[in-house]
């Protein structure tokens, strides 16, 4: 498993609103502004909002950061076809009533989004202590599929099992869903944890993630978007790119860059540093995904 990306597979550019990446195997003309087709579309990924977290040393605006992100999404000049939240909607709590209160608080905030199609998946903070019971009460299934303009989306739950596994039953479901697709189908996978072993000692891995990757490998056009690690990170497993997103409550340090994983303290000189969301412009015919990172704005 290599950590680098060849130029043909991964190109970093500077773009309006943040850093733009081109993810995919198609020609790089998209990055230079090639005209899109009628089937191209745009969606937004937000992650790790951690409603219920309340340490002002880490984020003094813990009650307002998600609201700022919602306002920024609403102000985008092109509204997305849909929005995806990739887990840790709430911050962990042992109290089942408090867990539901936090999930309700999250839902109340995101109800202000202009876009009507908003999808959700759990993180371990939402689901690991009750196998996803509370999450399902508010948002429905923890794993599912949907299709949009020729792209097949697969949402994998690797958090409801407290061992950090997908589990045999869900892997069988995944195999069945993939069998319905042609080998050159456009496939986008959403997970919370990384499917590969990024930093297992920090819980940045999925115990049986290699089995999911093995099922995906025969398909030519697959990309994975995930959260959990609270930072942008890009890695290839074979021909499959995996893209981690910024969080919206606090950043975390680079993988294994210090003895223990802990939130990065708030920097008053650079408020909201490394907090943000991303837009993904899907170029369907050539299976490219142009990723724009949007930092949270003060005010």
Please report, for each region that a protein language model flagged, where it lies by residue:
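N-terminal export signals
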Residues: 1-4, 9-31
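Solvent-exposed loop/turn segments at secondary-structure junctions
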Residues: 49-52, 89-92, 124-128, 159-162, ...
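A contiguous binding-surface segment within folded domains or other stable secondary-structure elements
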Residues: 199-211
């Amino acid at each position: 498993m290599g950590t680098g990306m060849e130029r043909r597979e991964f190109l970093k550019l500077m773009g309006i609103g943040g850093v733009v990446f081109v993810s995919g195997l198609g020609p790089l003309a998209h990055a230079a502004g090639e005209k899109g087709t009628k089937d191209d579309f745009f969606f937004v990924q937000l992650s790790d909002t951690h409603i219920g977290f309340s340490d002002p040393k880490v984020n003094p605006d813990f009650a307002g950061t998600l609201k700022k992100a919602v306002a920024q999404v609403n102000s985008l000049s092109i509204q997305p076809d849909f929005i995806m939240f990739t887990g840790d909607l709430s911050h962990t709590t042992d109290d089942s009533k408090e867990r539901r209160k936090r999930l309700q608080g999250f839902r109340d905030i995101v109800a202000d989004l202009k876009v009507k199609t908003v999808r959700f998946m759990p993180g371990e903070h939402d689901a690991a202590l009750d196998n996803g019971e509370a999450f399902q009460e508010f948002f429905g299934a923890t794993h599912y599929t949907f299709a949009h303009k020729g792209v097949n989306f697969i949402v994998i739950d690797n958090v409801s099992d407290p061992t950090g596994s997908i589990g045999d039953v869900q892997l069988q479901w995944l195999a069945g869903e993939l069998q319905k697709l042609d080998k050159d189908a456009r496939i986008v996978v959403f997970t919370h944890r990384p499917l590969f072993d990024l930093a297992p000692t920090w819980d940045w891995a999925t115990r049986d993630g290699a089995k999911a990757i093995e099922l995906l490998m025969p398909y030519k056009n697959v990309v994975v978007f995930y959260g959990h690690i609270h930072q942008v990170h890009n890695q290839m497993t074979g021909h499959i790119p995996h893209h981690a997103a910024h969080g919206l409550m606090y950043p975390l340090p680079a993988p294994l860059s210090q003895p223990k994983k802990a939130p990065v303290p708030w920097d008053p000189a650079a408020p909201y540093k490394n907090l943000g969301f991303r837009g993904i412009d899907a170029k369907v015919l050539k299976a490219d995904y142009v990723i724009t990172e949007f930092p949270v704005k003060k005010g």
